[in-house]
UniProtKB/Swiss-Prot annotation:
InterPro entries: TatA/B/E, TatA/E. PANTHER family: SEC-INDEPENDENT PROTEIN TRANSLOCASE PROTEIN TATA. One of its GO terms (biological process) is protein transport by the Tat complex. It is found in: Cell membrane. This is Sec-independent protein translocase protein TatA. Disulfide bonds: none annotated. The gene is tatA. The chain crosses the membrane at residues 1-21. Part of the twin-arginine translocation (Tat) system that transports large folded proteins containing a characteristic twin-arginine motif in their signal peptide across membranes. TatA could form the protein-conducting channel of the Tat system.
Length: 93
């Protein structure tokens, strides 16, 4: 009941083609393939890094970074805004 039959896959493929168009699908598939290759190579590199022990005897302490000046100039509050007098014209009777 939960398995996808071939008809379900055909309908899904048709909906994808309708939504994205046939011109964008090859580019999307190519980009996905490149991303997967990069991901696999990074995973393999991480596994190789974990298998080779890091040199522990010659670890250097991280260099001390200069501290940036964090003082700020005092901020003066803006002057209060005075309400403008409203000019009303006398109503003619």
């Amino acid at each position: 009941m939960g398995a996808m039959s071939p008809w379900h896959w055909a309908i899904v493929a048709l909906v994808v083609v309708i939504l994205f168009g046939s011109k964008k699908l090859p580019d999307a598939a190519r980009g996905l393939g490149r991303s997967l290759r990069i991901f696999k190579s990074e995973v393999k590199e991480m596994q190789n890094d974990n298998s080779t022990p890091a040199p522990t005897a010659q670890q250097s302490a991280p260099a001390e970074l200069p501290v940036a000046d964090t003082t700020t100039a005092p901020v003066t509050p803006p002057a209060p805004v005075q309400p403008q007098p409203q000019h009303t014209e006398p109503k003619s009777a």
